[in-house]
């Protein structure tokens, strides 16, 4: 696996053990100390080896004297209350709200990222005020949200903050959900599972070349991550952003869907989302809706039971239909629930259990 791009600490960086407004820096998890004052990060598959006064690829974790610190603990740069369907989760608490947070930074670099202004930023670029996990959890309660969502950037890189927010939320009756690229180490992922109710994975494509050339990442660790989720019992859904000419071939979609059915489960909800020109790929036009419909039909034919189309207002394939009796289960319009016929986790018409987190 390729090595890391490390960033030298800027002159005048925050002194060891203190942040600029007096809040303490938080020591990172998942690292080991090496000779010569270096450390090896074990949070994600990059395994960055970081020298003193350097940062890992994500730009938000720094070696200071042989100890590794998170520079974004307690520093959310984005906070918003969203419908949970916007994440999107279609089989998790339909119609509920999610209090969404993010810090700067990411451990990959997608050329089409819609949140590039924060995902590709560093703590030196954006310095929001400190907010403790207890504060975040209380804000979630006051917002009327049922869940805390770690989203917009990559939650893996603010793991310690996410974990503490999840614990604080749980103590106040708020569950946690994660929107992730799945690029996380096995050790960190196993620590995450008990803290969260559901995970949504942005599965970028089904080719190594796409991950390498478009995202500066690797597909194999993401596949391994998805397999671990399937074995863990944690609910998860998959979103694939279909980009014209790059990951929209019928063959690739067929192979991806077949792999999901075989290696994960036919019950994993699969969302095909429409691409809109963004960041470094503004030259590629939006995805034709018919391309998404073709992808959906291929996935259904391969055995996926719940296949959705996203970013197309009014699309019929936003709805959830019972795979047993074909009754309408959940009728949606954009992010609103118009009809919900799931009763005690089962289809109201035929009584068969519908996979998801409903209650």
Which residues make up each language-model segment?
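Auxiliary Fe-S-binding modules of radical SAM enzymes
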Residues: 2-49, 246, 250-359
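N-terminal [4Fe-4S]-dependent radical SAM core
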Residues: 21-40, 46-102, 116-120, 328-331
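Short, cysteine/histidine-rich loop/knuckle motifs that typically chelate Zn2+
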Residues: 43, 57-60, 105-108, 112, ...
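Extended interfacial segments that mediate partner engagement and assembly in macromolecular machines
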Residues: 68-156, 162-163
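Short secondary-structure boundary/capping segments
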Residues: 90-91, 190, 339
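Hydrophobic packing within well-folded, soluble alpha/beta domains
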Residues: 110-113, 178, 238, 350
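Conserved AdoMet/S-adenosylmethionine-binding subsite of the radical SAM
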Residues: 130-290
């Amino acid at each position: 696996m390729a090595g890391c791009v490390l960033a030298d600490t800027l002159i005048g960086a925050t002194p060891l053990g203190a942040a600029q407004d007096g809040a303490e820096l938080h020591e990172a998890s998942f690292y080991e100390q090496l000779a010569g004052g270096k450390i090896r990060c074990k949070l994600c598959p990059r395994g960055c080896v970081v020298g003193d006064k350097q940062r890992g690829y994500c730009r938000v974790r720094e070696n200071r004297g042989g100890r590794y610190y998170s520079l974004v603990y307690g520093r959310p740069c984005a906070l918003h209350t969203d419908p949970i369907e916007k994440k999107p989760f279609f089989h998790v608490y339909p119609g509920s709200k999610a209090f969404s947070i993010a810090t700067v930074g990411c451990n990959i670099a997608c050329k089409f990222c819609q949140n590039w202004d924060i995902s590709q930023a560093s703590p030196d670029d954006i310095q929001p005020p400190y907010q403790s996990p207890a504060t975040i959890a209380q804000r979630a309660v006051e917002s009327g949200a049922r869940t805390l969502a770690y989203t917009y950037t990559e939650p893996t890189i603010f793991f310690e903050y996410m974990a503490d927010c999840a614990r604080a939320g749980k103590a106040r009756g708020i569950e946690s959900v994660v929107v992730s690229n799945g690029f996380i180490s096995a050790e960190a992922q196993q620590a995450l599972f008990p803290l969260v109710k559901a995970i949504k994975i942005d599965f970028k494509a089904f080719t190594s070349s796409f991950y390498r050339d478009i995202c500066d990442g690797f597909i194999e660790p993401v596949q391994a991550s998805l397999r671990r989720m399937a074995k863990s019992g944690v609910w998860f859904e998959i979103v694939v952003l279909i980009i014209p000419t790059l990951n929209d071939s019928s063959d690739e979609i067929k192979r991806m869907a077949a792999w999901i059915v075989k290696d994960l489960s036919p019950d994993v909800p699969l969302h095909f989302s429409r691409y809109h020109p963004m960041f470094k790929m503004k030259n590629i036009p939006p995805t034709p809706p018919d391309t998404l419909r073709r992808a959906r039909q291929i996935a259904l034919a391969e055995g996926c039971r719940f296949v959705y189309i996203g970013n197309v207002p009014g699309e019929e394939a936003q709805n959830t239909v019972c795979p047993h009796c074909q009754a309408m289960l959940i009728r949606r319009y954009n992010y609103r629930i118009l009809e919900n016929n799931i009763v005690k986790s089962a289809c109201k018409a035929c009584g068969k259990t519908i996979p998801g987190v409903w209650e």
